[in-house]
Structure formats: C-alpha cells, structure tokens
Amino acid sequence: MQQEIRNSNTPNTGSGNPVSNLSSALRQVHLGNSNTTTDQSNISIDYTSRAPQQQPLDELSRGAAGGPAAGGGPEGSNMVGASSAAQVTAFGGPSVVDSSRITKFFQNQPMEGYTLFSHRSAPNGFKVAIVLSEMGLNYNTIFLDFNLGEHRAPEFVAINPNARVPALIDHSLDNLSLWESGAIILHLANKYYRETGTPLLWSDNLAEQAQINSWLFFQTSGHAPMIGQALHFRYFHSQKVPSAVERYTDEVRRVYGVVEMALAERREALIMDLDSENAAAYSAGTTPLTQSRFFDYPVWLVGDHITIADLSFVPWNNVVDRIGINIKVEFPEVYKWTKHMMRRPAVIKALRGE
C-alpha cells in the first residue's frame, strides 16, 4: 500500500476567502442549477461485449482494469447482452429462471468469510469488491448470469428482495445478508473498526465519520445514478432523446464539479501545510500551486488517508468516458485522485475480479 501523505483540513483565513489562485479559479467552475432528485438508474447492457472497444481513462486503466471488470451498470438495473435483448422481458430477465447454481451454493454455504454476489458489468459490485480487497478480507465472488435469471432465484431474492446486485453474505455473523452497496461497505468499515480498533478506510473521529458518510451518500444517490442514466439514454433507450442525454451528462459534470472543488481545496491545504516556505507566494498568487513539488501528491476527500468515501467513486470514474466526459481534461484533480486509487494493488486485484 502506498504511503499516505498527511493532509490538513482546508485552512480558515477568517474571511471565508480562498487562500490561493487555485481555489479562486475553481470557484468559477459552473456547478449547474439542476434540482434533480433522481436516485434510480436503468441500464440494459453487458459491457463485457464492448470491452475490447473501450479505452477507459487511458493510462489509469492500463494494467489495472483487467478487461471487463471495470464495466458499467448500477444497482437497480439488470444488465444483459445486447445480442440477447430480445430473449428477455423489459426489466425482469428471461421468463424461465435457471437457479440451479444458486440453489447449490445456498445448500452448502461457507462457515466463514464473505460471499459477494455481483455481475461482470456492475460498478457497484466492484465497489464492494474493492473495499473487501483493501481490507484484506477473505471473500468469494459469485458473478450472476442475468441471462439465466439467477438474480431472480428464490434463494437470492430471499437475501435481496430488490433482486439486484450487489448483495453480500457475512458468514461470520450467522450468514447475515446485506444489500445496497453503500450499506454493505459501511458495514464492512464499521465491523473492521470494532473488531480491530483500526479505522481502516474509516476514521476514529466522529466528525470525520459524518463527512465520510456524506460523501458516500453523495456518490450512491447522485454520482452513480446520473452516470447510469446518461449511459442509458446515450446508448440503450428505445428512442433517441437528445435532451435527456444532455440533461444527465450535464448533471454528471455538475457532480464532478463538486468533487473537483473539494479535492482542489484539499490539495491547496496540503501544499500550504507541507510547502510552508512558499505559502506567502502561493497565497498572493505570484507563484502557481502547480509549481509545488506536492502538486501531484495524493489527497483524499476526508482526513489524511484514503477512505470508503474515495474508493466508492472508482468503478464509476472508470466508465464515465463513455458518456463523453474526459476527466483528465475537464477535472484534473479528479483525474489525479482516480489515478492514485487505480494504482493500488488491492484495487487492481478487485477490478480484475480476482
């Protein structure tokens, strides 16, 4: 695991004004005026078949994405191969369910560790896998076959009444079942902290815990669904609706503007803290922050180390180029942040489906 660099909170100047030219410039970013409250996404696609044509996030994915693992599709969606679309109903999958593989698993469950139910094209499933991998936990992944209707197997619906992925079984807690990616990774973070006393991907500070929760809810309710809707209307909706494509793509940009601002302020605080001999020049704007040797150091949304708040964005950042957003050009802080996370061995392992 790469060494974490200390990062202080955004400095308080007493006047509420930004302390350098970086945050001043970023405050000009158009954050939009959307008042959307949509929290559902529907994508009908298996990106596995599209993987050879995709080059998501250029060098960010080299050696890390491992092919189809980084594909796109949210909770609340059943993704099926485009070639088999005619064989399924609108949202429910095939009319006949083959649940034999799922039934066999539930007849002989493990006694320990975790079982993750996911899909090869489900970013939210890989979100959970990343956290499990980062924590070094023992887990096995069952990638459901939606073409067989495995997500509708009675045994699976019993642990996830929403019949979507991801779902997780915690075998150490009498086969406790959890669903919804945000709830799952919060459980993992809290359990790890309680059992070990180490706030891995978490915090022992109550205020920071609240901030982590805020970003996590922002990602699950705003970031992921907007990308999901943009993908749906761009590629798979039965009719071309340019206004819908534009509306959801603009909303994704607005969301990234929020993240970009937060990361930029974190970077500014880090540079002012670690590069104190040049702080006056940075504050005056006579020396750009880009000249600091700390300009490419990792910064995180909350506190001085990576948390579940940061990692929850990774799989979705890896597919956003498919809606025409180049984060390297449009959101450079988001790009650097994603790059640091995509290079982590545990993230690489999880995205490869290992």
UniProtKB/Swiss-Prot annotation:
Keywords: Nitrate assimilation. This is Protein URE2. GO terms for molecular function: glutathione peroxidase activity; glutathione transferase activity; phosphoprotein binding; transcription corepressor activity. Belongs to the GST superfamily. Plays an important role in the cellular response to the nitrogen source. URE2 gene plays a major part in the repression of GLN1 and GDH2 genes by glutamine, and is required for the inactivation of glutamine synthetase. URE2 gene product may catalytically inactivate GLN3 in response to an increase in the intracellular concentration of glutamine. Residues 205-354 form the GST C-terminal domain. Residues 64-75 have a biased composition (Gly residues). Residues 1-56 have a biased composition (Polar residues). The keyword Transport does not apply. Homodimer. GO terms for biological process: negative regulation of transcription by transcription factor localization; nitrate assimilation; protein urmylation; regulation of nitrogen utilization. The keyword Magnesium does not apply. It comes from the Eukaryota. It holds the Pfam family GST_C. Residues 1-80 are annotated as: Disordered. Residues 112-196 form the GST N-terminal domain. InterPro entries: Glutathione-S-Trfase_C-like (IPR010987), Glutathione-S-Trfase_C_sf (IPR036282), Glutathione_S-Trfase (IPR040079), Glutathione_S-Trfase_N (IPR004045), GST_C (IPR004046), Thioredoxin-like_sf (IPR036249), Ure2 (IPR017298). GO terms for cellular component: cytoplasm.
